[in-house]
Amino acid sequence: VLSSATKTFNIAGTKNSYAVIENPKLRLAFQKRLLANNQHEISGLGYLATEAAYRYGKDWLEELKQVFEDHINYVVDLFGKETKIKVMKPQGTYLIWLDFSAYDLTDETLQELLRNEAKVILNRGLDFGEEGSLHARINIAMPKSLLQEVCQRIVATFAKC
């Protein structure tokens, strides 16, 4: 098992990943690879941050999950009522895929509308492969007021299409 508290608790940069490897041969091979790549050091800050997150972060995490669920429902409801954008409800993440294929657009035009008209920058679907054509990914890990502003800009832009 390879894991870290990085994304869940927003402590990236603290060198806090860890491995649980029961098989002694695999563990030794893994340790050798870490040493060869100069990735074997433990960060005191990362260790403490991970321990604090796992030990004391449960209530905070439950509250965060509720905030994200509220944000997801907001995006689904707004775009479902106000646009032809299909929202793919995420599972276990704060990244939502938006499907713009109901509009008669090219990928280039979609990006131009988002950037120049709506004044938002989303992850281009094509960056994830051809099946991402006419899709974009929005990160909802932001204050609700900012999410509302971003989504309202998108709604206003695509109301004209």
PLM features per residue range, with description:
Residues V1-C161:
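PLP-dependent class I/II
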